[in-house]
């Protein structure tokens, strides 16, 4: 299914019929230019479970300011340039359309904001998700430093919620003599 969210934040509940979060879904956290393998593995598990798939992108350039009692989430940008998050979501949608076109699974996209682990956790609670799928981080010194300061999304999800998590390797396994900090 093509994007039923029309760019709307899946956390918002302003219009419960058009923005309802699919129940018992498989959730996959996706970033732009991520290998297609993460999406195809998530689709495979959604098909096995007979569950819908939510392709979630977290805009880390925005943060949650507050949530209305009705569930509508208000956000504010960290940077005044909003176009970065919108462009990333468009790239995620294009990748999802290409990867999931013939997958035989109902899917939708969700734009989340803030900390990736907390945003995915919140969405998983709303959907009563069966599984959360994420990819490993990219190799390279820059990604190692980023992970040192922000932590692994997969590890943080494993410690902060109780749903099963599938971590999909992005690259071929490293050999024993490979440099883990080398850019790929």
Region spans (language model):
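Structural beta-alpha unit
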Residues: 1-22, 34, 48, 98-132, ...
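Small/aliphatic-rich secondary-structure junction motif
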Residues: 2-3, 17-76, 184
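Short, well-ordered secondary-structure micro-motifs
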Residues: 38-39, 65-68, 121-122, 144-145, ...
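General small-molecule cofactor/ligand-binding pocket signal
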Residues: 54-56, 108-112, 166-168
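A short acidic, glycine-rich active-site loop
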Residues: 74-91, 142
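Glycine-rich, Arg-bearing micro-motifs that act as flexible, cationic patches
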Residues: 131-159, 175-178
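Short, acidic/small-residue loops that bind anionic groups at enzyme active sites
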Residues: 155-169
């Amino acid at each position: 299914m093509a994007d039923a969210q029309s760019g709307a934040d899946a956390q918002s509940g302003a219009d419960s019929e058009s923005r309802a979060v699919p129940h018992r879904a498989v959730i996959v956290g996706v970033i732009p230019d991520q290998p297609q393998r993460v999406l195809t593995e998530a689709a495979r598990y959604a098909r096995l479970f007979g569950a819908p798939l939510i392709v979630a992108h977290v805009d880390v350039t925005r943060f949650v300011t507050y949530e209305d009692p009705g569930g509508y989430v208000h956000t504010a940008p960290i940077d005044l340039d909003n176009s970065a998050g919108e462009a990333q979501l468009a790239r995620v949608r294009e990748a999802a359309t290409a990867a999931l076109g013939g997958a035989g699974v109902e899917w939708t996209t969700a734009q989340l904001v803030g900390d990736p682990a907390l945003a995915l956790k919140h969405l998983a609670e709303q959907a009563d998700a069966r599984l959360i799928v994420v990819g490993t981080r990219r190799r390279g010194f820059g990604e190692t430093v980023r992970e040192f300061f922000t932590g692994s999304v997969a590890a943080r999800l494993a410690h902060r919620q109780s749903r099963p998590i599938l971590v999909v390797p992005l690259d071929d396994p490293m050999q024993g003599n490979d440099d883990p900090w080398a850019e790929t």
